[in-house]
Amino acid sequence: MSDKSILEQALKICRNLLDIDPPATINKIKDSVDKVNRILQLSDEDNSYLLSRLIEVTGTDQDEPRILDNDTIIPWVIDKWSENADNRRFWKRYRDYLADEKKIAPKVISRLDELTDKILDRLADPDAHDQFDKRGLVVGHVQSGKTSNYVGLITKAADAGYKLIVVLAGIHSTLRSQTQLRVDEGFLGYDTVTSRSFSENNNLIGVGRIDPGVQAHSLTSSALNGDFKRSVAEAVNVNLRGTDPVVIVIKKNTSILKNLINWLSGKIGENYGENERIINNIPLLLIDDEADNASINISKSSVSSINGAIRALLRLFRKSAYVGYTATPYANVFIPPPEKAKELHKGIRLVVGNKDYPVGEDLFPREFIINIPPPSNYIGPEKFFGIVDENAIYDQQETLEDDSRSDNSIMHLYEPVKDYQPVEYFDNKDIAETVRENNLNFIPDKHQKDDAKPRELPESLRKAMKCFILACAARRVRGQINVHNSMLVHVTRFITWQNHIALLIIDELDRYRNRIEFGSPDFLDDLKMIWDQDFIPKTEEISVLKDVGGLDMTPVSWEKLKLELFPAVTKIRVRAVHGSTMLGGLDAENIQPVDYYENRKKGLSVIAVGGNKLSRGLTLEGLTISYFLRASKMYDTLMQMGRWFGYRPGYLDLCRLFTSSDLVSHYKHIAVATEEMRAEFDRMWLLRRKPIDYGLKIRAHTGILTITAANKFRYKKMMSFGFSGELEET
């Protein structure tokens, strides 16, 4: 087979030819391959690969979104685009970036183009209105590409005339930094870190390499400490009333939000009434990532600090649009409608130093709610764990335990951890206490910060580490060398425990590295057995599935794999991911962030040990192996912890989840509940219901799981359904 770069060039030419005359039929695909072959003189093997790859890429599809609207929509976006060919410069270079650099399927890009136009239509034309306040919610799937979606919306909004774009990017600095980098690549086109350091190096990245002439500014950077600071904003000296759009990516942090409000009010605000400031003629788009986390008001008698600050920021602008994004809308379902919330929180103001700002209405998405289906190559809980029928209500035990009715799309990529037993498993309290005292239990469900910590890793975690080494080596055999590889270890929320486990993993990894370097026969035999019994059959099973990238999952022989074991294990690093800089009392001092960007040229292979920082939003690049024993009783928390969902092009067959059988059962139940909720949403769409009717039924899991945190869950009503699916009186 030819060099990979030549095949990538051939693939790009074919896709460009197919874009000229859509749709991409099989005859058109063959014709494009023939034309490219005349130019590049490819081998028969190359032609066969190119044809298969094009069929796979063009075959990736995505259904249309379902939208609940408050009012009849009067489209304005298409007319705006048609006024001037240059009106979509931000979007056009982002579209080309997705196609050429990210290799996103044409149909998926086309759906994104349509969807972002539809969202903008439901906001407001910033040039045609003197005042507006629009609210909406976009519901996706965990790790399904929500960031790509809202970066696309940002580009369209900037093209349409929105001048200030604020992105609320979770509650942790690592997630904010990662989100800023995605904005740098997809919208700004330059590295916000090197641009601040006045580096002489070319700092163009992402879309900037496609069209560097499109200008936008940022008041924040992708550095871990690059959140909004008043001093930095003043030093950057960007004209907020200029022609170029400005983006600000911040954490959901009360003090940061207050500082931003104060600075914007003083910088571009005008006096309005007796004690109020207002910002005129600068349209604001506020993107709320993970809109169910921290943004929800959790106080019944007052307004939560972050919720109030977000509402005050929106209220500061005469022209504002709010769009929330989430994969777990369980809490958003129970936000009270505007009329009720207005009575609850009338006249409340946000105090910032010696100033105060009026708090606007709650974040209920009154204009629209959009449910986005994932692309056909997305691996979600229904494919990972299996559900029986997403549109029906089943007996709980039958749904969770009977896989006999499951279809062939279920991947079965999980392995039950059998050497893990919660203390509660033991009926005899004396036995349970003996287990705790003698440290026989690796991570008890209800362990405390100061409990005795494990002295060694359980066999299941040692096997997971071996699987990670094998996965890294196999990707190298497939030519995926300078790429990121990640393993997730999520077993505790306590920082001291995370560091202790990281230290145990570092020691174990050193032993594995030495055994591979010196060719330990027993260790290599162990690796070969795992490869032959587990990985080879799974590759054969998945490689025939075209909709998940199976054509790129070429079988790897042990002979070739063995040669890549040492290069693979040598690259692996261990990171304790929690963000604490206090080293006192910690075993492992390797508390660096998972620095993918700094290792972008050669790729980072990392075992990330963490807790809450790995639970929501943060993407682990090239994730193959997950070891997950963290118990939670909330639907939204468990789903967000599922970092293993998403896209694994060319290496899905190498992915594994090690977890307890209880957690597998919980995920199966939540998969059913979530798909039922989405089916109910689709039913409401067919009936032309409005967002205010978004009080969906969500299947409860009596006595074991709860839907969301109790303080987000006040406006609920419990119902009971019989086997017929009809409501029963209780």
Predicted features along the sequence, with ranges:
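Conserved pre-motif I regulatory segment
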Residues: 101-137
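C-terminal helicase lobe and adjacent C-terminal extensions/tails of nucleic-acid helicase motors
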Residues: 388-528, 532-536, 543-549, 645, ...
